[in-house]
Amino acid sequence: EPYRRQRQMCIRDRSVAFREKLKENYCISGVRQVEKQVSKKEDTAKYLFALEDDHVIESVWMKYRHGNSVCISSQVGCRMGCTFCASTLTGLTRNLTAGEMLSQIYQIQKDTKERVSNIIVMGMGEPLDNYEELLRFIKLVSCEKGIGISQRNITVSTCGLVDKIRMLADEKLQITLAISLHAPNDEIRRQTMPIANRYTIGEIIQACKYYFDKTGRRITFEYSMIRGVNDKEEHAKELAGRLSGLNCHINLIPLNEVKERNCYRSTKEDIEKFKTILEKYRKTVTIRREMGSDIDAACGQLRKKFLTKNGRN
């Protein structure tokens, strides 16, 4: 409420004619902080933000030696239905505007009093399902007159909307494209990701090759390690074969478990073994560093808890 009053006061300083023109042509939208969780190490903070229509979204701030990263949401909820993700539990409510995406970054910079140097569009929602606003956001946030973050420091994650990947490639931006793959074959992928019924892994890989040819940017493949589902030795070998000849980086993710979903994290030993096998096939592999494991780390968890507490779920 104070945030809204502050903006209204700024607008009242302008002429009546100017205010009427703004009212006819523009809508000012932003976010306000509702809740914040800080990890014990103080290197991670999770934010719950409310929008003008009182819907809520999440963002995460992560402090690294090389700079500060923010993971932002692109939609209120998500309609992709991945079985290991809390964001999909309530479905999709609506898309975020470019302004609402930008506002998450501005509010976190204001709260932390630190500059954000890296942006990850990997929070709630499927970014490419909100393509036009995502594109506006990227161009605005990388503009020198705005926050001025280099496109090379922006990562956009997608579950694999092939047509939109090709459209994004034609924009010839310098962002990093991250594919939420999470399976070495279509059979396993269909068990956990409904989008696999629409696009095969083969089609996604072809779109990734097109993206690389157009932009020269290496692709990242995100692979959540799910116990007993996709973490066996044969899965690692199959994944290596699938990605053969593609300029890519594989990011193994210890799964953030969601109690409403029957998915569990692979053991540390199995994750390390998986990594070793991929490296034998000369793949560039990292295991995502765990940050904020003592707070509601999984995407969508904090929002779900808030909605349940307030009888909105």
What would you call each of these model-derived segments?
Residues 1-7, 11:
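Single conserved hydrophobic/aromatic residue that forms the stacking wall/gate
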Residues 10, 71-73, 77, 84-86, ...:
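Conserved beta-strand segments that form the floor/walls of ligand-binding pockets within enzyme
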Residues 18-74, 101, 105-115:
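N-terminal [4Fe-4S]-dependent radical SAM core
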Residues 63-100:
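Canonical Radical SAM [4Fe-4S] cluster-binding loop centered on the CxxxCxxC motif
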Residues 109-118, 123-282, 288:
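Conserved AdoMet/S-adenosylmethionine-binding subsite of the radical SAM
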Residues 289-295:
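A short, acidic, flexible beta-alpha connecting loop/helix-capping segment that sits on the rim
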Residues 309-313:
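Acidic, low-complexity intrinsically disordered tails
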